C-alpha cells in the first residue's frame, strides 16, 4: 500500500461496501508498510461540498480520483478550493456528449490551469498507463533518444482471455463511449477524423507476437499533440473479431446510445446503461483471466542525422496481477501508475504546484519507480531489447546536449 510514503489512506466511494472490500483485501494480504489509518467513507463525489467536507475531515493532502471520468470536474473543483493535490487517470467526460471537439483537455481540465497556478495546486492529469505512462515514454524518447521525433504510435494490446462470451475490462459505459464516436488522431500537425475500425495495422511485438490493432481516439493524443512538437501522434488498440462483431451489432441496433428512449410501457431508459447492467461486472473477470498485456510507444525520428526507431513498452501478466491485488492486469496497469504519481508528489519530484499532463513532468523518476512497483519498462532499438536503465537515459541526454540538439 506504500503508506510508508503516503501516510494515512482514506478510500471513498458511493458504495461503502466496495471500500470495505478493498480494505479487507489489503489487510488480508498484510500489504500495509507500517501501522496507520486505512479507512472507508461513503461519498457522492459529484457533490463538491461533500467532497470538500471529507477532505477537511480527513486532512488529506493528495486526492487520487480513480472513479468514473464523469466525476473529474467535481473532484478537481473540490481540490482547488481546498488547496490539495489532485490526480486522475482519464480525461473528463460529459455523460450527454460523446467524442467532443479536440483537444479534449481544452474542453474541461485545461480551463482550470490558471486556478491551479494561482492557488499553487498540483494537478496531474491522466496518470494511469494510457494515458499516463505512455506520455512519460513519449517524453523520454523526445528528451533522450532523438534529435527530432517524427511520429509516435501508441499501441495497446490485451492478449489475454477472461473466458466469457462478451465483457469489457472496465466500466462498459466508459469503454463503449470510446468507440462509438469519431476517431481523432494527430497527423501532419493537424486533427484528422476517421471511423472506428476503419484503419488497422499489424506489428510483431515482444512476447505477445504479431498483433492487429485499430486506429482509436484516446486521451493522450490530445495532450501530446499540444505539448510535444511531433507531427504524427496516433493511438492503436487491439480488438478480436468476436469483440468487433458483437460491438457492431450492439451499435447498429442503437443499444450503445447515451440518449434516452421510452419503452412501450412508458419507462425512460438509456440503452447504454441497460447494456452495462446486463454485462458481467469487470471486477468479476479477474479470477479467470489468463495471458498478458502489451502497452508501448513506437517512436520514429532522426538521431545523428540518421532515421531511427525506438519501442518503449511494458508487458504485464493477468494472473500475476490477480495474485498480488485480486485484479486483472488492465486494472493493475491503470492503478499502479496513479499510486506512483501520488508517491512522487509526496516525495516532491512531481509536486509542481500547477496543472500538468504527465509528459510535462520528469519521466525518469516515474518510470524508475514503476519498475520497483511491478511495472517494468523495456526498450527495443538498434542496440537490441533491454530493460530500461535510468543511467542510460542520463547518458543519452548528455550526448544529445553535447551535439546541441
Predicted segment positions?
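Adenosine-phosphate binding glycine-rich loop
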Residues: 109-157
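Rossmann-fold NAD(P)-binding glycine/threonine-rich loop
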Residues: 89-121
